[in-house]
Amino acid sequence: IVGGNEVTPHAYPWQVGLFIDDMYFCGGSISVTLTGWGKP
């Protein structure tokens, strides 16, 4: 769910979920600083 709307699985690959003992704990996103044309 992004912005309250259901999305296609894997549509936002930078979104992550943290599970502890098979229970959802929290979520976040992966980010990286890019320079030029998408090169880290």
UniProtKB/Swiss-Prot annotation:
Keyword Hydrolase set for record: yes
GO molecular function, a single term: serine-type endopeptidase activity
UniProt name for this protein: Fibrinolytic protease
Family: Belongs to the peptidase S1 family.
Organism for this UniProt entry: Euphausia superba
Phylogenetic lineage: Eukaryota, Metazoa, Ecdysozoa, Arthropoda, Crustacea
Keywords on record: Disulfide bond, Fibrinolytic toxin, Hemostasis impairing toxin, Hydrolase, Protease, Secreted, Serine protease, Toxin
EC number annotated for this UniProt entry: 3.4.21.-
Function: Serine protease with fibrinolytic activity.
